[in-house]
Amino acid sequence: MPDNASAQQPGQPAQGPNEHYHQPLNQPRALRIGVAGPVGTGKSSILATLCRELAGELSMAVVTNDIYTDEDARFLRSAGVLPTERIRAVETGACPHTAIRDDVSANLDAVEDLEEAYGPLDLVLIESGGDNLTATFSPALADAQLFSIDVAGGGDVARKGGPGITGADLLVINKTDLAPHVEVDVTAMVADAERARDGLPVLALSKHDPESIARLADWVRAVLVRHRSGTHVPTDPGPMAPHSHSHDGS
């Protein structure tokens, strides 16, 4: 923060210990897209793909979430998809959904720090730590949500439902190039997903298929156009199902 950031300005409320940076009202805030999905479904690969496709035309940054490590951030930095300083890691220390839905302050701090340091930004991608089929972002953190499943998880995954599958702005069925090896019918899997999503978009994606990558990038561009025009309204896919985790090794 600038040296004078803590000084109270006339007409501003007193600033407490949890002070946040906010984009000036006359500057558009970056579009924030959350990327969620179970462990191993290719979320980091999706982020890397989007950075490669869009960084030449948009000013971008990335925030990753892991429980105890910065593994995803290190993967993206090593891939060279963005300047390393534009990739921030949040170590949640708790269940992945906590930091993207229940208490988003750590992620908001990371996003706002990036906007202050490198703004104005066009796009910030926020990757959730791997969780289950019900993980979703709070609309207070993400303007739009992409949920990733993959063919290696089984051809019936989309039929299992959950708010991420049924209500995210975009459902990605990832790693379609692996379908022959795991005996999954991608066409049937897409059809199941479309039935579950009642008209919301579904994208079959492979990092080896330029056409599917182009469709993914075009989806982001379309959301950004709506965001800039003020016509995009963040929606909440719904809360996670009641559940519990044990992190004490018992």
From Swiss-Prot:
Residues 7-17 have a biased composition (Low complexity). It comes from the Bacteria. GTP binds at residues 37-44. Keywords: Chaperone, Cytoplasm, GTP-binding, Nickel insertion, Nucleotide-binding. The keyword Acyltransferase does not apply. GO terms for molecular function: GTP binding; GTPase activity; nickel cation binding. One of its GO terms (cellular component) is cytoplasm. It is found in: Cytoplasm. Its main location: cytoplasm. Residues 1-24, 230-250 are annotated as: Disordered. GO terms for biological process: urea catabolic process. The keyword Cell wall biogenesis/degradation does not apply. InterPro entries: CobW/HypB/UreG_nucleotide-bd (IPR003495), P-loop_NTPase (IPR027417), UreG (IPR004400). It holds the Pfam family cobW. Homodimer. UreD, UreF and UreG form a complex that acts as a GTP-hydrolysis-dependent molecular chaperone, activating the urease apoprotein by helping to assemble the nickel containing metallocenter of UreC. The UreE protein probably delivers the nickel. NCBIfam families: ureG. Belongs to the SIMIBI class G3E GTPase family. UreG subfamily. Facilitates the functional incorporation of the urease nickel metallocenter. This process requires GTP hydrolysis, probably effectuated by UreG. This is Urease accessory protein UreG 3. It comes from Streptomyces griseus subsp. griseus (strain JCM 4626 / CBS 651.72 / NBRC 13350 / KCC S-0626 / ISP 5235). The gene is ureG3.
